[in-house]
């Protein structure tokens, strides 16, 4: 059936995490609307509250009164949220706290050495389970600034170092191989921190005065929007408009891929919200051409690769995603989860030299295997609905991690 709809979505998850953390130590009262309503962001709220942060829901607003944070009484449970675990490691260290971080079974398999190494170099005493959660961090002694070259492109690791650097005795410098999402840098600049960005080199100075509070309407999450966009693109004679969507250049690799395969997109009402470019974006359905994604684009579409792989399944040939090994360290081994689901749906897909290959074809009906991973679940529900108008899935509860309103939006689109 044809889709012709306009949707408004919950706020960007990455921005929501960062806004909560920085507002919790700002000098005054911050108000946030359209905060992401998923379980991951709730994990960050509960973690900050365990450290004494004042965070209250007031109607549609979340009100945060900045104050000095304190050591939590118990280990902090980050649930399924890698962003919470990695960013809080640096952020709470900047406040010279002693704390422990735990997580669910999935998060407890994800690599933490990538933050343990730089934070230890800065002066944190860290105990871990052989590089995995739980982590116990003692940052009560003075922290020193570091010069750190990132071994992998990771906004979480970069942000952990930059946030820790706020409480260091000297400046910290981070050098990236490829640009990753820069919400931490933008928000720090807008809240009064001294941070200098020169291409892929970022320097942050220790905070000499408190951060300025913010009033923020969080723009729509483009990673969440991607599922609905692809469903519309795969539906003949369809179009969808996403209102007030985040258009940060480090987050629109997904749109760039769509434009490369001649999917028509129209942007209107462009504006900035606290340094972040946003706008209303229209996407119009079209036949799908196969495509190739170069390695340097992968960091900017890492969360959208599952849904782009679904798009490729309907393509006219072989699609190649180069250097996607980082997918193996997400909420699931997403690389294998994508391949397994595509094969279940009758689409040939395989790994070759750390690249993902998808050969377009005609899907056959199957049950979606979620691997308890929200993005895998949503991506392959879209595939099933686009191909058959219905779906079966082994676990849909995991979708609440990032987008509790997913099914409501699907229902609106199809009504």
Residue ranges and their predicted role:
Residues 1-415:
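Structural preference for solvent-exposed beta-strand-turn elements
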